[in-house]
C-alpha cells in the first residue's frame, strides 16, 4: 500500500543507484579538459602511472574517475567516439560487478571498454564473453585500436586455435571469446598433463555481453568433453523401426479419452511416459524383433539400456521436429537454439537422443560418447572473482540473477527518450487468420516506405510467412538457421525503405538495424574506395534515413509470443534505437503453442462470448495481461528447473573442485614421493585389516588370503606363514611394519634402476592417469544415480538428500580407489631406463591424440537434471535459496577442522585426504 508512495518520495532502488553514480560522472567530466590537454604519449603513459599507483596500495575504485576520463579521451582520439554520461554510469555498474541493462543501440560494446580498461590495469586478465565467434572477433577488432593506444594487449580465443596462439590470447591483458570456448578451455586445462599445457590463468574478471542469453537461456545446458563409447548404431536402427507403431494416448482435461494409445505426452514439461498398455506392447515388439528374450521384463536391471533406447526413440519421434528443434544439413543433424534461431554447430544431445534422431532421419549414426569432463555455465562463471554483464533485457529476470549469481541489475537511462510505440496484441481465433493479418500489415508498411522486421519462433513459421509473401509478390529476405551465413549482411540492410526481413527469434542479435541501411557495409563492398563514391554513398544513405524516419521508422511484427517476456522485449527493442521512431505489434491466435498450452481458459471463453467472426481480432489490455500472466507462469517453471539443476550440480561441483584442486597440486609438485608413500601405507593398512582384523586372535587371521593380495595388488611374494612359524612373537603391528619394509625395499630397487628423477615423473603421470580414468567412471556413475534418483520420492524419501548422501559415499569410494589403483600400477610396473624428457614427450603425444578423439558437447539439459516430472520436484520443502555470490578464494581449512562438506568427519579424514 505504501510502496508506491515511498517510491514517489524517495525513488526506486534503481533510481538511487543511478543518482549515486551521477556524482562520480560529474567528477569524470571535471577531468575532461585536463585529459584533452595531454599529448598522445602523455595519455598513453597514464596506464603505467595507474599500475604504479595500484602497486603502492591505491584501489581500482580510487582510480576510477581518472581512468574513465583517460578511456573516454582515448575513445575520442582513436575512434571518434565520446562516451556519453549514461555510458559512464554503465561502465561503473560493470566495474561494481553488476548487470547493466541498456537498450538496443545505446553502445554496450563501447561501455564495456571503461570497466575492461580499469580492471585490466591490475594485470590479472579480463575476459569479455560473447555469444558467438563472429561477435568475439568483431568486438575485439573494433576495440583493439583503443586498448593498444592505451598500452594494453588484446587476444581472441576461438575453436581449433593452435595452442601457442591460444596461450598468447589468454596471456593478454584483455581476452575476447565465447562462453563455450572459455568453458571448454577450463575443462581442457583440468585434463592437462603438465602446467605448460594449460591455457587459462586464475579466473579474475569477466564481462558477459548478452548476459541473459548466457546465464539464463544457456544455464540448463551442460558443457561436456567426451570420448567415444561402444558402438550401438544397429540397435538404434532396430528401435527406430518399432517406434512408429506406438500411438499417442490423448485425454481431455475432463478425463474423457479421445484416443487410446501407448504413451502420454506432457507438453508443458516436454516429458513422455509409456502407459501400462505401452509397456506391454513395446515388450511384445522387442521380443518379436529378437531384442528382448521371451518372458523377460523391460525393467529388469540388465535391460535398462534397452529401455533408455526406447525412450530416446520416442522423444526423437514425438518431441523433436525437423525445422523446429533441428535441421538436417548434409549428413548431420544440427540443433537449433530456440532463443536465437541459430544452428548450434558441434552440439549434440546426450543419452542417445541425438543418435535416435539420426536414425529417424535415415542418416549415418555417429558413435555414442562417454563423459570425460563436464560443468555448467552456472558453476563455471561463479568461479570468477568478479562477474558483470550487459544486455538490453535483464530486469524481468532480476530475481534469478540475484538468487543464483548474486548479481544486481541496474537499468541505465537512455541517452535519448524512447520514441517507439508498442501496440496491444491482436488475438485471432486461428493461425490462418493471424497470418493473413500479418501480410496485410506488411503491405501497408510497404506502401508507406517503412522497413519491416517479422519475428518468428521457428524456421517452419519463417518459411511459411515467406511463402505467403511470395504469393503476394512481396520482395523479402529470410534470416534463419538455414541461411545464418548471410546474417550480418541481411540485418545490416534491414532498415532500408520498404525492406521486409523475416527472422527467427533473435537471429542477428548484436548487430543494429540502422534506418536507411548501413552505409559502411556498402563502402566495404567497394574494391578501391575513393572520397567521391564514399561521399555519394553517404549522401544516398542520408536521404533514405530521412525517408524512413518520416515514414515512422522500423515496424516490428511478431508472429507469436515467446515463453519468456524477455525474448519478446528483445524483439521489440530492435525498433526505436537511440530515440529513432518505430513501432511493434504482436499477432497471436488461440492455436499458438503458448495460448494452447498455458493461456487460461478465461481468454478463450471471453473471445467466444464476444461472438467473434472469422478474420476478426480482439485487442484488449485484459488479453495482453492474461498472456503476460501465462508467460510469468512459464518463466517461474523454467526458473525452478534451472534452480533444481544447480542444486544437483552443486553436489558434483564440490567434488569437481576437490578433484581439480588435487590435479593442480600434482602438476605443481616437483616431488610426490611422500604422497605415494602415504598412499602405500594406507592401502596396505586397509588390505591387512581385511585379512587380519584389529585386536583379533591369530586363529582368525587369513594369512593365505593376505599373501594372495600382496602378490596381486603389490606385486610381491612374501612368505608370511613362514615368518609367523619362525617367530612366535611376530604380532599384528610388527607384521605390518615388516610387510611395509619389504614393499619399500622392492620399490627402492626400481628407483635405483630407473633413477630418482625418472621415477618421480612416472609417479606423477601414473597418478594423473589413474585419477582421470576413475573420475571419468565416477561421472558416469553419478549420471546413472541422477537419472533414477527421483524415484526415491515414491518411497517418501527426499530425492535431493538421497542424492547428496549417495554421491558422497561414491566420492569416498573414488578417493580410496585412486590410492589403491595408483599403488597397484606402480607396484607392478616393470622398470627400464628411459630419458624423462622422452617419457614426458610420449605422454604429451598420447594426450594430444586423446584430444583429437574428444567431442566438445552441449548435452541436453536432462544430462544434469534428474529425470522427473514437476510433481517429483515438489517432494522437498520449498525454501528460497540464499543469494549466491561469485566464488572468492576460500580460506585455508585446518587438517583437524570439520570438513565443510557436512560429513561430520575431520577434514584430513575426508576431502583433505588427497591434498
From Swiss-Prot:
<dbReference type="Pfam" id="PF01043">
    <property type="entry name" value="SecA_PP_bind"/>
</dbReference>
<dbReference type="InterPro" id="IPR001650">
    <property type="entry name" value="Helicase_C-like"/>
</dbReference>
<dbReference type="GO" id="GO:0043952">
    <property type="term" value="P:protein transport by the Sec complex"/>
</dbReference>
<comment type="function">
    <text>Part of the Sec protein translocase complex. Interacts with the SecYEG preprotein conducting channel. Has a central role in coupling the hydrolysis of ATP to the transfer of proteins into and across the cell membrane, serving both as a receptor for the preprotein-SecB complex and as an ATP-driven molecular motor driving the stepwise translocation of polypeptide chains across the membrane.</text>
</comment>
<keyword id="KW-0547">Nucleotide-binding</keyword>
<keyword id="KW-1278">Translocase</keyword>
<dbReference type="InterPro" id="IPR014001">
    <property type="entry name" value="Helicase_ATP-bd"/>
</dbReference>
<dbReference type="GO" id="GO:0031522">
    <property type="term" value="C:cell envelope Sec protein transport complex"/>
</dbReference>
<dbReference type="GO" id="GO:0005829">
    <property type="term" value="C:cytosol"/>
</dbReference>
<feature type="binding site">
    <location>
        <position position="512"/>
    </location>
    <ligand>
        <name>ATP</name>
    </ligand>
</feature>
<dbReference type="InterPro" id="IPR011130">
    <property type="entry name" value="SecA_preprotein_X-link_dom"/>
</dbReference>
<keyword id="KW-0862">Zinc</keyword>
<feature type="binding site">
    <location>
        <position position="87"/>
    </location>
    <ligand>
        <name>ATP</name>
    </ligand>
</feature>
<protein>
    <recommendedName>
        <fullName>Protein translocase subunit SecA</fullName>
        <ecNumber>7.4.2.8</ecNumber>
    </recommendedName>
</protein>
<dbReference type="InterPro" id="IPR027417">
    <property type="entry name" value="P-loop_NTPase"/>
</dbReference>
<feature type="compositionally biased region" description="Basic residues">
    <location>
        <begin position="905"/>
        <end position="915"/>
    </location>
</feature>
<comment type="similarity">
    <text>Belongs to the SecA family.</text>
</comment>
<feature type="region of interest" description="Disordered">
    <location>
        <begin position="881"/>
        <end position="915"/>
    </location>
</feature>
<dbReference type="Pfam" id="PF21090">
    <property type="entry name" value="P-loop_SecA"/>
</dbReference>
<dbReference type="InterPro" id="IPR004027">
    <property type="entry name" value="SEC_C_motif"/>
</dbReference>
<keyword id="KW-1003">Cell membrane</keyword>
<dbReference type="GO" id="GO:0065002">
    <property type="term" value="P:intracellular protein transmembrane transport"/>
</dbReference>
<keyword id="KW-0653">Protein transport</keyword>
<dbReference type="GO" id="GO:0046872">
    <property type="term" value="F:metal ion binding"/>
</dbReference>
<dbReference type="InterPro" id="IPR000185">
    <property type="entry name" value="SecA"/>
</dbReference>
<dbReference type="Pfam" id="PF02810">
    <property type="entry name" value="SEC-C"/>
</dbReference>
<dbReference type="InterPro" id="IPR014018">
    <property type="entry name" value="SecA_motor_DEAD"/>
</dbReference>
<dbReference type="GO" id="GO:0005524">
    <property type="term" value="F:ATP binding"/>
</dbReference>
<feature type="binding site">
    <location>
        <begin position="105"/>
        <end position="109"/>
    </location>
    <ligand>
        <name>ATP</name>
    </ligand>
</feature>
<keyword id="KW-0479">Metal-binding</keyword>
<feature type="binding site">
    <location>
        <position position="899"/>
    </location>
    <ligand>
        <name>Zn(2+)</name>
    </ligand>
</feature>
<dbReference type="GO" id="GO:0008564">
    <property type="term" value="F:protein-exporting ATPase activity"/>
</dbReference>
<keyword id="KW-0472">Membrane</keyword>
<keyword id="KW-0997">Cell inner membrane</keyword>
<keyword id="KW-0067">ATP-binding</keyword>
<dbReference type="InterPro" id="IPR011115">
    <property type="entry name" value="SecA_DEAD"/>
</dbReference>
<dbReference type="InterPro" id="IPR036266">
    <property type="entry name" value="SecA_Wing/Scaffold_sf"/>
</dbReference>
<dbReference type="GO" id="GO:0017038">
    <property type="term" value="P:protein import"/>
</dbReference>
<dbReference type="GO" id="GO:0005886">
    <property type="term" value="C:plasma membrane"/>
</dbReference>
<dbReference type="InterPro" id="IPR020937">
    <property type="entry name" value="SecA_CS"/>
</dbReference>
<dbReference type="InterPro" id="IPR011116">
    <property type="entry name" value="SecA_Wing/Scaffold"/>
</dbReference>
<keyword id="KW-0963">Cytoplasm</keyword>
Amino acid at each position: 500500500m505504501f510502496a508506491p508512495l515511498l517510491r514517489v518520495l524517495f525513488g526506486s532502488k534503481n533510481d538511487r543507484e543511478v543518482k549515486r553514480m551521477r556524482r562520480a560522472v560529474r567528477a569524470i567530466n571535471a577531468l575532461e579538459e585536463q585529459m584533452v590537454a595531454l599529448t598522445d604519449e602523455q595519455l598513453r603513459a597514464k596506464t603505467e602511472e595507474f599500475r604504479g599507483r595500484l602497486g603502492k596500495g591505491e584501489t581500482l575504485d580510487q582510480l576510477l574517475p581518472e581512468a574513465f576520463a583517460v578511456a573516454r579521451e582515448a575513445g575520442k582520439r582513436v575512434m571518434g567516439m565520446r562516451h556519453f554520461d549514461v555510458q559512464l554510469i554503465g561502465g561503473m555498474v560493470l566495474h561494481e560487478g553488476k548487470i547493466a541493462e541498456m537498450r538496443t543501440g545505446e553502445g554496450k560494446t563501447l561501455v564495456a571498454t571503461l570497466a575492461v580498461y580499469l580492471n585490466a590495469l591490475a594485470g590479472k586478465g579480463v575476459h569479455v564473453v560473447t555469444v558467438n565467434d563472429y561477435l568475439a572477433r568483431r568486438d575485439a577488432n573494433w576495440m583493439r585500436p583503443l586498448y593498444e593506444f592505451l598500452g594494453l594487449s588484446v587476444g581472441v580465443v576461438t575453436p581449433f586455435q593452435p595452442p601457442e596462439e591460444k596461450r598468447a590470447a589468454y596471456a593478454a591483458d584483455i581476452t575476447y571469446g565465447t562462453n563455450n570456448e572459455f568453458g571448454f578451455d577450463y575443462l581442457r586445462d583440468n585434463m592437462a598433463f603438465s602446467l605448460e599445457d594449460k591455457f587459462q590463468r586464475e579466473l579474475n574478471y569477466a564481462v558477459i555481453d548478452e548476459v541473459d542469453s548466457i546465464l539464463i537461456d544457456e544455464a540448463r545446458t551442460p558443457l561436456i568433453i567426451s570420448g567415444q563409447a561402444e558402438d550401438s548404431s544397429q540397435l538404434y536402427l532396430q528401435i527406430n523401426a518399432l517406434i512408429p507403431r506406438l500411438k499417442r494416448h490423448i485425454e481431455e482435461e475432463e478425463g474423457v479419452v479421445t484416443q487410446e494409445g501407448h504413451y502420454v505426452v506432457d507438453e508443458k514439461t516436454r516429458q513422455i511416459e509409456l502407459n501400462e498398455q505401452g509397456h506391454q506392447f513395446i515388450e511384445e515388439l522387442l521380443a518379436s524383433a529378437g531384442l528382448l528374450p521371451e518372458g523377460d521384463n523391460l525393467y529388469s536391471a540388465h535391460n535398462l539400456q534397452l529401455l533408455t533406447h526406447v525412450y530416446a526413440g520416442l522423444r526423437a519421434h514425438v518431441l523433436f521436429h525437423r525445422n523446429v528443434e533441428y535441421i538436417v544439413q548434409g549428413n548431420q543433424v544440427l540443433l537449433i537454439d530456440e532463443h536465437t534461431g541459430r544452428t548450434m554447430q558441434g552440439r549434440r544431445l546426450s543419452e542417445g537422443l541425438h543418435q535416435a534422431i539420426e536414425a529417424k532421419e535415415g542418416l549415418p549414426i555417429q558413435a555414442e560418447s562417454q563423459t570425460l569432463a563436464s560443468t555448467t555455465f552456472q558453476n563455471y562463471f561463479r568461479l570468477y572473482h568478479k562477474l558483470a554483464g550487459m544486455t538490453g533485457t535483464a530486469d524481468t529476470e532480476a530475481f534469478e540473477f540475484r538468487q543464483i549469481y548474486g548479481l544486481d541489475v541496474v537499468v541505465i537511462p537512455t541517452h535519448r527518450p524512447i520514441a517507439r510505440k508498442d501496440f496491444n496484441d491482436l488475438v485471432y481465433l486461428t493461425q490462418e487468420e493471424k497470418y493473413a493479418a500479418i501480410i496485410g500489415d506488411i503491405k501497408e508498411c510497404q506502401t508507406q516506405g517503412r522497413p519491416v522486421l517479422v519475428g518468428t519462433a521457428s524456421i517452419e513459421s519463417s518459411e511459411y510467412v515467406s511463402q505467403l509473401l511470395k504469393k503476394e509478390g512481396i520482395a523479402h529476405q529470410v534470416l534463419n538457421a538455414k541461411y545464418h551465413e548471410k546474417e550480418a549482411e541481411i540485418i545490416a540492410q534491414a532498415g532500408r525503405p520498404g525492406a521486409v526481413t523475416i527472422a527467427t527469434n533473435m537471429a542477428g542479435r548484436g548487430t543494429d538495424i540502422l534506418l536507411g541501411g548501413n552505409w559502411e557495409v556498402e563502402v566495404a563492398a567497394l574494391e578501391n574506395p575513393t572520397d567521391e563514391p564514399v561521399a555519394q554513398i553517404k549522401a544516398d544513405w542520408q536521404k533514405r534515413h530521412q525517408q524512413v524516419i518520416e515514414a515512422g521508422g522500423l515496424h516490428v511484427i511478431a508472429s507469436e509470443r515467446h515463453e519468456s517476456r524477455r525474448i519478446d522485449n528483445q524483439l521489440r527493442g530492435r525498433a526505436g534505437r537511440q530515440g529513432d521512431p518505430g513501432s511493434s505489434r504482436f499477432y497471436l491466435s488461440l492455436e499458438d503453442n503458448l495460448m494452447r498450452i498455458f493461456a487460461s481458459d478465461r481468454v478463450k471463453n471471453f473471445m467466444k462470448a464476444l461472438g467473434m467472426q472469422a478474420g476478426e481480432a480482439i485487442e484488449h489490455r485484459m488479453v495482453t495481461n492474461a498472456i503476460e500472466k501465462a508467460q510469468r507462469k512459464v518463466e517461474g517453471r523454467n526458473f525452478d528447473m534451472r534452480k533444481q539443476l544447480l542444486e544437483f550440480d552443486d553436489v558434483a561441483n564440490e567434488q569437481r573442485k576437490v578433484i581439480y584442486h588435487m590435479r593442480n597440486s600434482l602438476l605443481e609438485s616437483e616431488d610426490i614421493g611422500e604422497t605415494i608413500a602415504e598412499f602405500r601405507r594406507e592401502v596396505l593398512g586397509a588390505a591387512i585389516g581385511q585379512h587380519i582384523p584389529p585386536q583379533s586372535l591369530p586363529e582368525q587371521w587369513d594369512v593365505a588370503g593376505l599373501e594372495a593380495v600382496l602378490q596381486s595388488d603389490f606385486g610381491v611374494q612374501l612368505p608370511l606363514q613362514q615368518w609367523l612359524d619362525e617367530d612366535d612373537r611376530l604380532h599384528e603391528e610388527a607384521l605390518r611394519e615388516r610387510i611395509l619394509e619389504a614393499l619399500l625395499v622392492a620399490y627402492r630397487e626400481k628407483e635405483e634402476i630407473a633413477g630418482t628423477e625418472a621415477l618421480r615423473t612416472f609417479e606423477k603421470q601414473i597418478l594423473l592417469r589413474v585419477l582421470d580414468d576413475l573420475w571419468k567412471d565416477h561421472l558416469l556413475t553419478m549420471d546413472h544415480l541422477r537419472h533414477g534418483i527421483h524415484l526415491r520420492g515414491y518411497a517418501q524419501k527426499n530425492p535431493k538428500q538421497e542424492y547428496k548422501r549417495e554421491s558422497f559415499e561414491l566420492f569416498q569410494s573414488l578417493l580410496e580407489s585412486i590410492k589403491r589403483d595408483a599403488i597397484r600400477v606402480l607396484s607392478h610396473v616393470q622398470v627400464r631406463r628411459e630419458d624423462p624428457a622422452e617419457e614426458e614427450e610420449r605422454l604429451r603425444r598420447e594426450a594430444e591424440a586423446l584430444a583429437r578423439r574428444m567431442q566438445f558437447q552441449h548435452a541436453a539439459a536432462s544430462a544434469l537434471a534428474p529425470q522427473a516430472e514437476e510433481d517429483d520436484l515438489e517432494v522437498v520443502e520449498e525454501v528460497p535459496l540464499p543469494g549466491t555470490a561469485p566464488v572468492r578464494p576460500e580460506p585455508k581449512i585446518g587438517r583437524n577442522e570439520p570438513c565443510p562438506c557436512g560429513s561430520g568427519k575431520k577434514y584430513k579424514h575426508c576431502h583433505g585426504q588427497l591434498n
